[in-house]
Amino acid sequence: LRLALMKASALPHNLFSAFVALAHGDTYLTTLSDIDRARLYPYSAPSGGYLLANGALYDLDQKMIDRHRWIFDDRVAVLSVGSNRAPVQLRRKFGDAAIIPVTPARLFDCDIVHAAMLGFYAAVPCTAFPCAGCIVSLNVAWLDAEQLEQMHRTEGIGVAYDYVMMQDVVHDLLVPDQPVYGYSARSGVLDYAGGIPAALPAIVAVGRRFPEVSQADAAARVRQLTGCDDSRSHAEFIADVQRDKT
């Protein structure tokens, strides 16, 4: 059976011996505490391409892509705008056995802003929002059919997010030419001040026009809008939400 037709889970464990470990890869996979899952959203992500395989990170540059085109076979390109950019989140969602190629990409005429909702683990998530002239540096996760179903479950399709085809995405590497999909928050964007959205400082952008607002300040705004603006610290609020989830 040709390698390209084999399921990722059936691939030999040592298949990735030809790949080079990503520099400082372990720092991107450090397990987060429950509080830090919300406090540190959307987490650190490499600026270039990487391969998550068997719980480890490998460099995925153009040379490796050209040598191993099979890693994209039967996969869907999904633009990651928030925590899904980060290896620690992909590993948490898909486990140590997962094999996921991730490649850098830019989204044009949009920024990544805080969404008007609170995640079940108390992070204020994010979504893409039109912003003429703005270019954001993101990445694309190449998911197989089972991984895509799992991603849909974690994103709350039809409740928290819609699954949509993305426009104006430009890949930074030569990868398969196919549609790019993504997730759009059904709640819309957080009104940070006078109807102005708030951008995420962790997302690199050129031509950004919206103010950059930290996770703590975004959560404070959500608390203000929902009548939960009290004396609790951000960490205390997170802990209470995670306990209650109501």
Task: Briefly describe each language-model feature range.
Residues L5-T246:
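Glycine-aromatic micro-motifs
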